[in-house]
């Protein structure tokens, strides 16, 4: 009997110890789960901004407001398809054309609080979306070229027509940024003049690149004199001490814009995120510290170029259709990219 009693006592102690350890582990698991998926107010965000951009802002937003945001990164096309399938978010951070197209479907609320500092050209006139960041197209100039040609005029006409200048630019088929660039050129110059200028430039384009950073990298490596580049991409190279100078086109330029919009059914937490973005988020130093060097759309004074020049952005409506874009891209391939323009 004593042996049986001892065995029972041993089993009871064993179960007690395992029970204690199980409860402790479960409590620890719940703590970890809450850290990863914290309770409290939540919002959902869809974005096509460069990977990781929005996630950098979330710790600061949560610390300021106590609101958590779940971010889903996708392409602009995927965002449109997701909304067509009835899967909505609270806030949308996306490129201008995506926001323009979705606004026409009635997906967004009209909301203008805190957006007064954003220029009219960078926001919807009905308040359905507002520009958050701009990435203007600039000249990334090889430093040696700039020093040897101190009187060079950094205008579109001079860059495209000066045969001795080696140019690198994006293939207009490569990215949304580059195809949007072709649409902007056509809208500003008109179809005939835009293609004439592009054809005139073609013989001294040394590379049509597939990646956004390529034109500025080519200039930094002295494989071209001037890379037609996004400001963000050129600034990142400068931050890495690469030998380029950023020059703004004298007669103005176009920009790729990212903006924010509220879903038509968004609540107060979503509005708090929207307000925070324009009050603090767009200029949060966390972005620049991690290499995201866009210009805030509500900047009081955009940065000067490396010669002290001001940025002038063309007034463009960008109301083109996908079929119209495809037609113009096809024309560029036939009449410029693979034509004999020598």
Describe every region a protein language model picked out:
Residues 90-94, 225-230, 245-246:
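Paired acidic/hydrophobic, glycine-rich loop segments that form the ligand-binding mouth/hinge
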Residues 117-122, 135, 167-173, 197-202, 208, 277-299, ...:
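Periplasmic-binding protein-like
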């Amino acid at each position: 009997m004593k042996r049986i009693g001892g065995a029972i006592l041993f089993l009871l102690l064993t179960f007690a110890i395992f029970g204690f350890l199980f409860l402790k582990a479960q409590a620890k698991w719940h703590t970890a789960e809450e850290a990863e998926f914290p309770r409290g107010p939540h919002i959902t965000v869809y974005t096509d901004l460069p990977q990781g951009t929005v996630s950098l802002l979330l710790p600061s937003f949560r610390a300021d407001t106590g609101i958590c945001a779940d971010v889903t990164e996708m392409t602009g096309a995927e965002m449109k398809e997701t909304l067509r399938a009835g899967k909505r978010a609270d806030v949308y951070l996306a490129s201008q054309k995506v926001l323009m197209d979705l606004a026409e479907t009635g997906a967004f609320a009209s909301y203008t609080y805190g957006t007064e500092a954003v220029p009219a050209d960078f926001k919807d006139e009905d308040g359905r979306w507002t520009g958050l960041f701009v990435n203007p197209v600039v000249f990334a100039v090889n430093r040696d070229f700039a020093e040897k040609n101190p009187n060079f005029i950094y205008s579109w006409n001079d860059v495209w027509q000066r045969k001795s200048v080696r140019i690198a630019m994006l293939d207009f088929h490569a990215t949304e940024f580059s195809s949007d660039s072709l649409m902007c050129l056509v809208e500003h110059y008109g179809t005939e003049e835009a293609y004439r200028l592009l054809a005139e430039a073609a013989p001294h384009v040394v590379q049509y690149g597939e990646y956004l950073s390529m034109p500025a990298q080519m200039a930094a490596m002295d494989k071209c004199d001037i890379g037609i580049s996004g400001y963000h991409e050129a600034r990142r190279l400068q931050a890495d001490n690469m030998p380029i100078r950023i020059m703004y086109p004298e007669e103005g330029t176009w920009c790729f814009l990212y903006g924010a919009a509220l879903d038509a059914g968004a609540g107060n937490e979503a509005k708090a995120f929207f307000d925070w973005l324009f009050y603090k988020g767009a200029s949060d130093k966390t972005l620049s510290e991690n290499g995201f060097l866009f210009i805030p759309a509500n900047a009081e004074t955009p940065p000067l170029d490396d010669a002290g020049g001001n940025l002038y952005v063309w007034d463009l409506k960008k109301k083109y259709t996908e079929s119209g874009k495809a037609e113009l891209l096809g024309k560029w391939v036939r009449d410029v990219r693979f034509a004999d323009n020598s």
